Design a protein with these regions (language model features):
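Long, hydrophobic/aromatic-enriched structural stretches that serve as scaffold segments
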Residues: 1-10
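Internal, well-folded beta-alpha domain core
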Residues: 9-160, 167-169
C-alpha cells in the first residue's frame, strides 16, 4: 500500500533493517503485531472488517488486549510510541493501558488555499516518516521534528506536544 511505498524497506541497509526489526511494529487484522522480517502468507483482511467470533464482535475486540500487551512488552526500553498507523488500525490498541506516551504525527498538504489532510498523501507520509526514523535511528521526540522528506516541514505553530504537524506546500 501507500504507507509501504513511502517506507521503501527494500532500500534500507542491513543496519537499518536491524534497527527496524527492534523498533518498528506493524498492526495486522490477521496476525496482530508483526515485525518487519516476520514471514507471513499473503492475505487481505482489514482491521475494520465486520466479523464476529467467540465472544468478540469484531477484530478490534479480538486483538485489543493482545496487541496492547505486546506493545507494552516491546516498549519496556522506550517511553515513546510514535503512532504511524491509520486511525482504523490504531483503534485496536487500548491506549489507556499503554505504558508509554503516544505521539501521533499529522501530515497536511496545501490545497485550495489551505492546509488539509489528504488521505493518499498522508498514508505515504507515514511510511516516509517511518523510513526517516529508521535511517536516523531516532530515539527522542525531538528527532521526530527533524523530519523533512518529500517537502514536509515541521510546524511548531500548528503542533501540540503529542501531535506534531508537518506541512507541505
Amino acid at each position: 500500500g501507500d504507507v509501504y511505498q513511502g517506507l521503501e524497506f527494500e532500500k534500507l541497509s542491513k543496519k537499518e533493517i536491524n534497527f527496524a526489526q527492534k523498533h518498528l511494529r506493524i498492526l495486522s487484522g490477521l496476525y496482530g503485531v508483526l515485525k518487519p522480517l516476520d514471514i507471513i502468507s499473503p492475505y487481505r483482511l482489514e482491521m475494520g472488517t465486520k466479523i464476529s467470533f467467540a465472544k468478540n464482535k469484531d477484530l478490534y475486540s479480538f486483538w485489543k488486549d493482545e496487541i496492547t500487551n505486546h506493545l507494552n512488552k516491546d516498549l519496556k526500553s522506550s517511553s515513546i510510541l510514535v503512532n504511524l498507523a491509520s486511525v482504523e488500525y490504531f483503534s485496536s490498541v487500548n491506549t489507556e493501558k499503554l505504558n508509554s506516551r503516544v505521539i501521533n504525527p499529522v501530515f497536511k498538504d496545501f490545497k485550495n488555499g489551505q492546509y488539509k489532510i489528504i488521505s493518499f498523501y498522508a498514508k505515504k507520509a507515514r511510511g516516509l516518516m517511518a523510513k526517516f526514523l529508521i535511517e536516523n535511528r531516532a530515539r527522542s521526540s525531538e528527532d521526530l521534528y527533524k523530519f523533512n522528506l518529500d517537502g514536509y516541514k515541521f510546524s511548531k505553530k500548528e503542533s501540540t506536544e503529542d501531535s506534531p504537524v508537518f506541512l507541505r506546500k
